[in-house]
C-alpha cells in the first residue's frame, strides 16, 4: 500500500511538468512555426513628440489589421454620412493591403450615441459582401475630432 501511495505521489508531481512539456514537444512536430513578421502598410503613423503611438494599418501573415478610423476632419454630416466616410477609408486601407471588404472577419464599431445605431446600420448594410463579418458595437462618451462613429477591423488577404 505504501508503494502505491508513493507511485501516485510521483505521478501527480510529474503532471505539471507534462502539461508544460507536451505542447512544446508538439510544436517541434509537423509544420514549422510561422515566421513572426509584420508589414506596415503606410509610412505615416500618429506621433506625439516624435514617439509613434500606432500604425494606421499593418499586415501580419495573411491577416490585415486596420486601426480605428473616424470621420476626423471630415466629421460633418449625420451618422449615415460619417459611417459611409469611415467605411470608405477602411476600404481604401484594405485595398492597399491587397484585401477587400468581403474579406473582413471582425469589426468593432464605436458610437458616441447608441441612438445612432440604426442610422449607422443603414450605411453599414451591404458593405461587406454576402457574408458580413462578426461585429461588436459599443457606445462611448466621445471620439476624437467630433466624430460620431469610429470603426476598426481585421481582414484576411
Model-derived features: positions:
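N-terminal presequence-like segments and the immediate start of the first folded domain
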Residues: 2-84, 95-97, 112-157
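Residue-level signal for inorganic ion chemistry
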Residues: 90
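Short acidic capping loops at alpha-helix termini that bridge into adjacent secondary structure
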Residues: 100-104
Amino acid at each position: 500500500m505504501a508503494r502505491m501511495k508513493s507511485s501516485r505521489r510521483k505521478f501527480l508531481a510529474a503532471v505539471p511538468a507534462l502539461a508544460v512539456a507536451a505542447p512544446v514537444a508538439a510544436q517541434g512536430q509537423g509544420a514549422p512555426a510561422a515566421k513572426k513578421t509584420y508589414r506596415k502598410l503606410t509610412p505615416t503613423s500618429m506621433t506625439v513628440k516624435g514617439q509613434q503611438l500606432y500604425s494606421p494599418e499593418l499586415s501580419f501573415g495573411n491577416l490585415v489589421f486596420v486601426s480605428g478610423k473616424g470621420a476626423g476632419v471630415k466629421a460633418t454630416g449625420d451618422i449615415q454620412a460619417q459611417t459611409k466616410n469611415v467605411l470608405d477609408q477602411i476600404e481604401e486601407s484594405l485595398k492597399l493591403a491587397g484585401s477587400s471588404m468581403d474579406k473582413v472577419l471582425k469589426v468593432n464599431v464605436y458610437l458616441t450615441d447608441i441612438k445612432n445605431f440604426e442610422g449607422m446600420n443603414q450605411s453599414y448594410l451591404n458593405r461587406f459582401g454576402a457574408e458580413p463579418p462578426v461585429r461588436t458595437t459599443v457606445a462611448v462618451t466621445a471620439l476624437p475630432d467630433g466624430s460620431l462613429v469610429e470603426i476598426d477591423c481585421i481582414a484576411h488577404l
